[in-house]
């Protein structure tokens, strides 16, 4: 980011700050980051689609007028949600470097500046994973290699991975650190094959010091991706480089993952993160309020921590929702306001019935399939077995009749449902990995 853009934006937000209440400014304007300025077009990074919508409908003209007051120019404002993909797209558009080799800056490593060890809230549910991550960050490739972190959605896996990257770069700015999702790794591999750039792709991921791969479970079932990642893993490991991997489940429970990869993932340390307990949820809320400079009554945070239990994203999302509700309605934050703001979220969690649709969605996601696969006529094992599990769970967790369950799975006969239920029931008596899978699926279904 150039100095002129930074200085201009800082002056603009000082003008805007004088036009808004403290709550409105901290909620909507403070989180904006300028990205680029070209031909009177200003691109601003915002944290999510909800914030983008509010800014476009309520605050865009205010920003335009503040900039016009400073520069005598009318700028076109473009709000960009800062997902990995959009950050990467922005880099491609504004980075003059044409080489695929990674350079040492925060943007090239795709690290989120907010995800550091200092901003991570430690509790009983994540203490071990945090300690392992810090040990790896302090002594890359010497403590635990690879480090495999697993846990449910929104529990802090990605935060710890980014924190490791930041810590290493802070202590050794020359380190080549790359953070990538398994989906992005796959897409880059596909493009390298299509464009005949295999060498560049391999150089990018094998000539580095630290590789952080998020959501590794998504390479399961992708033979070419697994083949390439296997050789990438070997090259880095043999060169004594650090590998950190995250997943929503331990290696032994990732379906259709090659055994040679599974065994390598188990070479180092496996650390899990569980859902936060009440004390940790309270600490997370207080940390978020402090960082965002939000004045939230303690009893409101207790209310949120009592009602929202599943993950950190939902906790922080509930807090922002309450602040937004307060700002938009011009009402003080209280338990009554919090109850009103969260009524849809809380009531849906309390009253939502388990349905076959929910079961199919969870099972399909767990096994990296599409819901249509479970309903299809295909009988390959990687589809037939998850389908049988989904039928088993449908009979266990819903009141639907056998014919109705069969109908929801592509119009199958009720005898097929009976066969699936009996097969899974019998296998559960002797198959520990299946027991773990069913336990995890039940947990995810209950969180829906």
Curated annotation (Swiss-Prot):
Assembly with partners or alone: Oligomerizes as a right-handed, spiral filament on DNA at oriC.
Keywords: ATP-binding, Cytoplasm, DNA replication, DNA-binding, Lipid-binding, Nucleotide-binding
Gene: dnaA
Annotated Pfam families: Bac_DnaA, Bac_DnaA_C, DnaA_N
Family: Belongs to the DnaA family.
InterPro entries: AAA+_ATPase, Chromosome_initiator_DnaA, Chromosome_initiator_DnaA-like, Chromosome_initiator_DnaA_CS, DnaA_C, DnaA_dom, DnaA_N_dom, DnaA_N_sf
Main location: cytoplasm
Biological process per Gene Ontology, one example term: DNA replication initiation
Residues annotated as binding ATP: 154, 156-158
GO molecular function: ATP binding; ATP hydrolysis activity; DNA replication origin binding; lipid binding
Location of the protein in the cell: Cytoplasm
Annotated stretches, region: Domain II: 73-109
This protein's record includes keyword Nucleotide-binding: yes
Function: Plays an essential role in the initiation and regulation of chromosomal replication. ATP-DnaA binds to the origin of replication (oriC) to initiate formation of the DNA replication initiation complex once per cell cycle. Binds the DnaA box (a 9 base pair repeat at the origin) and separates the double-stranded (ds)DNA. Forms a right-handed helical filament on oriC DNA; dsDNA binds to the exterior of the filament while single-stranded (ss)DNA is stabiized in the filament's interior.
Domain characteristics, as noted in the entry: Domain I is involved in oligomerization and binding regulators, domain II is flexibile and of varying length in different bacteria, domain III forms the AAA+ region, while domain IV binds dsDNA.
Region feature (Domain IV, binds dsDNA): 327-448
Entry keyword annotation includes ATP-binding: yes
Chain spans, region Domain I, interacts with DnaA modulators: 1-73
Protein name, as recorded: Chromosomal replication initiator protein DnaA
